[in-house]
Amino acid sequence: MPTNALDPARIRAAFPALDLGVAYFDGPGGSQVPTPVAEAVAGALTAGLSNRGTVTDAERRADDIVTGARAAVADLLGADPRGVVFGRSMTQLTFDFARTLSRGWGPGDEVVVTRLDHDANIRPWVLAAERAGATVRWLDFDPDTAELDDLETVLTTRTRLVAVTAASNLLGTRPDVRAISDTAHEVDALVYVDGVHLAPHSPVDLATLGADFLGCSPYKFFGPHLGVLAASPALLETLTPDKLLPSTDAVPERFELGTLPYELLAGVTAAVDFIAGLASDAPDRRARVLESMAAVEEYEAGLLDRLLDGLGAIDGVTLHGRPARRTPTVLFSVAGRTGLEVYEELARAGVNAPASHFYALEASRRAGLGDDGAVRAGIAPYTTTEDVDRLLRAVSQKLTPA
């Protein structure tokens, strides 16, 4: 079926938090949650659950929730459900996989990280390399455009892994992950991609990206707070993580420590189903996800243009970064005001647009913003033109000279 246009009014009706009258531009830190997701979480908690098994209804219900969540994430990311791993957070999963992957590293080996990334895709690799005696190579970016430098400037035949973001949570930059993956694979390096900030804004396909590992966080796309990693089951079979002796050696379960949060996994499935229904009625959920996310991308691009044009026309406002491909995330400063002052003034106007480095500390420093960062405004499918205009009015009327 052809993609339908996004209907903001219909979408907004599913989010109780929007009834508070706040314009939420803090989606890059975590989206608001629609009613079907909250109901799925509550339903799982109250329906009767046990540890996974096949004897009782409660055991089978838990098993079905896990199986369903893996299938849902696979449909979202274009992955194999047998390669979907759940964890407490994307940060925790990356630390776990860094520890596992680095067991084979040693002096002379190299790891590439970028200054564009969230620290969750930097520090785990830096620490793992230090423990192994391997060398960390830094891939920089242009502080004016926020575009990554060429990977070949730091890649060598000794590179074991390249860690890169699919979209900067601070500046919105969308690097060419496929080109990076292809280049890294030429020297047999693995590619670990942070897709946390991309997944809420664009159709995603693991094979198209060419990455070996792709992580994301459901709470950024209307779901509960946990982390997800997708990889080839065959690749996961080659890895031996730390685990308890009685726990299964099966993939992907052997990477999941302890009992899974079944209620949160039920929420993940509901979030993917919600996304799939945003702008498509195709019979297959993967097709619905792709069509709906294409509609999301188109809708958000229009609001992004409005926001960029509006902020760019206000005296005293500086926009940071001008990447060629980007998510609908804008970082800006106001002359004579600290980021915190802007954040507080916007909050008084009913606009949630926080100020920080947002854990992209290396990127903030490279962009000349130090450890303070700047104000970040992120657009979501429930954002409206009225929300954008409200932010622009607050900046223009309350934060800049008359």
Where do the protein language model's features map onto the residues?
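Pyridoxal 5′-phosphate
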Residues: 1-402
